[in-house]
Amino acid sequence: MAKRKAVRKKVVKKNIARGICHISASFNNTLVTITDEMGNMIAWSSAGSLGFKGSKKSTPFAAQAAVEDAVAKAQVHGVKELGIKVQGPGSGRETATKAVGGIEGIRVTFMKDVTPLPHNGCRAPKRRRV
């Protein structure tokens, strides 16, 4: 019986000049998604997908590496301007936003914190006693 070859999708190069970098920094991981202005995904990366495991995923260095990887993938599609939307309380927030600004060939147009805050909604989980 013949072996089947793994079918891989061919990456179609898009020509997008502006995008939005969505950084979701949780306590356990940092997710970076780059979309166009309509919200269609161009590239993504995360600390876990780059090989960081366990508690190393939540470090600022892992967040910086995830941002650099996602922006490098987006630059293939012609992205030159990025807006930044940050969500979550994670330790990689500040490092990730600085990493976007430090990449050569990328101009940051805006920065916005889009962390959802309840106006006294659901009851919060009980505090941990460590």
Curated annotation (Swiss-Prot):
Q: Which NCBIfam families match?
A: PRK05309.1, uS11_bact
Q: What is this protein called?
A: Small ribosomal subunit protein uS11
Write the lineage as a comma-separated list. Answer: Bacteria, Pseudomonadati, Campylobacterota, Epsilonproteobacteria, Campylobacterales
> Which keywords annotate this record?
Ribonucleoprotein, Ribosomal protein, RNA-binding, rRNA-binding
> Quick one: a GO cellular component term?
ribosome
What this chain does, per the entry, is described as: Located on the platform of the 30S subunit, it bridges several disparate RNA helices of the 16S rRNA. Forms part of the Shine-Dalgarno cleft in the 70S ribosome.
The superkingdom of the source organism is Bacteria
Q: GO molecular function: any one?
A: rRNA binding
Self-association and partners: Part of the 30S ribosomal subunit. Interacts with proteins S7 and S18. Binds to IF-3.
Asked if Ribosomal protein is a keyword of the record, the answer is yes
Q: Biological process GO terms, please?
A: translation
Looking up PANTHER family in the UniProt record yields:
40S RIBOSOMAL PROTEIN S14/30S RIBOSOMAL PROTEIN S11 (PTHR11759)
